[in-house]
């Protein structure tokens, strides 16, 4: 997948606000999973230049939902989440996130077939450490870490703009510091991919209860763009959006009514202040540290 970018305001990989494993690349290989709907999209990353705000006064229901999905980080602090997805590897992957944004701590684990294959620990004071259990290696300071002060709110009309007919997307930094949070917890990429055209989807009139988490959510159904449909082999999609936070509790891409791609949350808790684990090098004495 080779893409060229027309405009890019921030170029160093270490400075990117989104994870290198995110599901939404633009015209560069910044993101390694999924391409955007729009082949010619450019990406913007916001520098910390203004205080954080929120847009609670959006009156259009669809725009309000889109804004909420793009800004989950404003409504999250303590969060524990587990989700299953087939959008990362060849099979099903289980993602677990434990985050305390105020404390600057997070832990992400990735499991395949019930076996944890990788972990990421983040501490805004100490940096981020990535652990690969398959190779028994760990990498200190594998990615930069961010706090709330690094990512001001961006008004919705500035998130998606067009230059010569080419859509340009502005991202906020992923302050959960979990590299795979883009699949559900900080789903900016997915929002840009399937929700930016508000004429292509509809949402439920009344909230429904998500069966696995018990959360009140909005159900969205729609038709993907031609590019997104061709990439994933789907002709429709549906998702459940947590009404309070905008987090994606489920996403399904379907072909002729059959599910092709999915992400399903099995746990989502924002009320319990679960202690977040920290990296302890002594626990990995038989692992090999590698340079970034």
Region annotations inferred by a language model:
Residues 153-204:
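Solvent-exposed helix/loop surface patches that form functional interfaces
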Residues 122:
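Detector for the Zn2+-coordinating histidines of canonical Cys2His2
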Residues 2-105, 134-166, 197-199, 207-209, ...:
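N-terminal leader/targeting segments and the immediate start of mature chains
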Residues 83-119, 127-129, 196-291:
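Gly/Pro-enriched, hydrophobic low-complexity segments
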């Amino acid at each position: 997948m080779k893409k060229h970018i027309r405009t890019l305001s921030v170029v160093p990989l270490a400075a990117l606000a989104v994870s290198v494993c995110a599901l939404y690349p633009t015209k560069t290989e910044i993101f390694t999973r999924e391409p955007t709907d729009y082949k010619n999209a450019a990406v913007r990353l916001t520098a910390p230049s203004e205080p954080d705000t929120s847009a609670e006064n959006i009156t259009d229901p669809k725009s309000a939902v889109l804004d909420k999905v793009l800004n989950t980080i404003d409504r999250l602090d303590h969060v524990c989440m587990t989700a299953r997805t087939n959008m990362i590897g060849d099979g099903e992957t289980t993602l677990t996130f434990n985050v305390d944004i105020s404390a600057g701590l997070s832990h992400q684990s990735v499991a395949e077939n019930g076996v944890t294959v990788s972990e990421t620990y983040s501490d805004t004071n100490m940096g981020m450490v990535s652990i690969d259990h398959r190779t028994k290696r760990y990498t200190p300071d594998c990615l930069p870490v961010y706090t709330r002060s690094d990512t001001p709110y961006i008004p919705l009309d500035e998130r998606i703009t067009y230059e010569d007919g080419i859509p340009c997307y502005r991202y906020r930094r992923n302050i959960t510091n979990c590299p795979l949070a883009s699949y559900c917890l900080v789903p900016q990429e997915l929002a840009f991919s399937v929700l930016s055209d508000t004429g292509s989807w509809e949402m439920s009139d009344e909230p429904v209860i998500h069966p696995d988490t018990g959360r009140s959510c909005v159900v969205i159904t729609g038709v993907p763009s031609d590019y997104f449909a061709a990439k994933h082999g789907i002709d429709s999609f549906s998702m459940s959006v947590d009404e309070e936070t905008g987090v994606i509790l489920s996403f399904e891409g379907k072909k002729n009514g059959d599910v092709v791609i999915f992400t399903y949350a099995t746990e989502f808790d924002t009320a319990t202040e679960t202690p977040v684990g920290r990296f302890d090098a002594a626990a990995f004495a038989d692992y090999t540290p590698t340079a970034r």
